[in-house]
């Protein structure tokens, strides 16, 4: 497994227990699958330099696992306009056998560490969802992730927030208000 830490711009960051994607047991196939697995922490991490993508591909990242592009063209206002979905399951237990034949479990899931680096490394703290708030689109961060299964898998590990953009839910437009009753 190779581990990377990259400067990225975040979009749709659902990286806290309070806002993780827990799926929907009554939703579409994908939503049901996420719900069945207990949910996921997920973010679209926009690259800030084309060399980041080159490094990953040179190191063996599978650019199209299961015939689905890994590097996706996105919103040009974030980074270089290309992103990768980075996720981590809420619970991701794998069974292994040690060298003595004894079985053991390892959980690769759980919430990633979210660290507040906005005041510098010497004043870093854990991000507090209630006090610091959710992460808005355009938040800048140092994102740590690892690749596994010969580059076919990518797992989110940690996020260090360097520049916070507050989350806004999007106020209704005048057109939206026209259809709101009560």
Regions found by a protein language model. Name each.
Residues 146-169:
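OB-fold/S1-family single-stranded nucleic acid-binding modules
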Residues 1-6, 165-182:
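Acidic, gly/ser/pro-rich intrinsically disordered tails
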Residues 69-71, 136, 166-168:
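Glycine-rich loops and low-complexity Gly/Arg-rich segments
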Residues 91-96, 112-118, 164:
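Short regulatory "switch" loops immediately downstream of catalytic or recognition motifs
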Residues 111, 115-153:
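Exposed beta-sheet edge/beta-hairpin loop segments within beta-rich domains
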Residues 1-106:
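OB-fold ssDNA-binding interfaces and closely related basic DNA-contact patches used
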């Amino acid at each position: 497994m190779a581990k990377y830490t990259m400067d990225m711009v975040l979009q749709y960051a659902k990286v806290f227990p309070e806002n993780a994607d827990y799926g929907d047991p009554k939703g579409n196939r994908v939503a049901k699958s996420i719900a069945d697995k207990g949910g996921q922490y997920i973010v679209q991490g926009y690259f800030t330099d084309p060399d980041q993508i080159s490094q990953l591909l040179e190191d063996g990242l599978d650019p199209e696992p299961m015939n689905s592009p890994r590097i996706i063209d996105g919103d040009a206002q974030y980074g270089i306009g290309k992103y990768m979905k980075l996720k981590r399951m809420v619970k991701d237990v794998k069974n292994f056998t040690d060298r003595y034949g004894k079985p053991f479990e390892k959980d690769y899931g759980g919430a990633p560490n979210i660290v507040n680096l906005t005041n510098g490394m010497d004043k870093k703290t854990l991000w507090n969802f209630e006090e610091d708030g959710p992460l808005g689109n355009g938040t800048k961060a140092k994102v740590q992730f690892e690749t596994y299964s010969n580059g076919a898998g990518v797992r989110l590990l940690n996020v260090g927030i360097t520049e916070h953009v507050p989350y806004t839910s999007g106020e209704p437009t005048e057109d939206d208000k026209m259809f709101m009753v009560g």
